[in-house]
Amino acid sequence: CRASVSCQSAEELANMRLGALLYTLGYGGAMLALCMLVPLFVSIVGGHWAHARNFTMGLTLTTFVSGALIISGLPTRRLPARNIDLLAVMLLFWFVLPILASIPLTSAIQVRSFMAGYFEAVSSLTTSGGGVIIYPQFEDAPILVWRALLGWLGGLWTLVFAVAVLAPFAIGGLSLVGSPLLQHDEDAALSSRLGRPMRVIFPYYLALTILGVIGMAAGGNGFVSSFCMALSGISGTGTS
């Protein structure tokens, strides 16, 4: 009887931890949805209706899925996070969210399948700089803007994960002992452990991005080119 109760408690705790992971993953999806608004606007203004349709589909699905994840994890969102939970959510951000991010990429000329779009999205969000879009000059502005935004968002996530996930383990020699970025309560939730460094890093990241766009535009480049080059530069993806 005790063993049965213990197994039931362990199962309930596992479900609670899964809920906390899904809740945090939902916020990552919400960030993707917000970023999709930019290339959707570019598609409408430029008359790229095929891209506008894909971005509308992607935005709708991403918003729905993200909302469902957040709602499903609400009851367990305050569960204290373990270090393994931080590592798990980092992997989910990098390899699950690209499924949603790849939907608009399927209308790109050089993306021949959904798996190719997924690979492109993973490459951008992990800031690896790879991908299947080798000749950006053949792609329309909405695709280039979306690829730049994915790399930019991936760069932001990489900085946050470096502080919240890698630094506590001193992975790669990274150590921020005593830094206010690592300060948190012992019973801090997963969303709180990631949210604190996000709130500190994001304003500087955004400010540098805006300065980069202004600098590129001042050099005589068009707005879309300046936007894409600035975002790829700040994120470190190196795409154009």
What positions do the PLM features span?
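Membrane-proximal intracellular helices of multi-pass ion channels
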Residues: 1-240
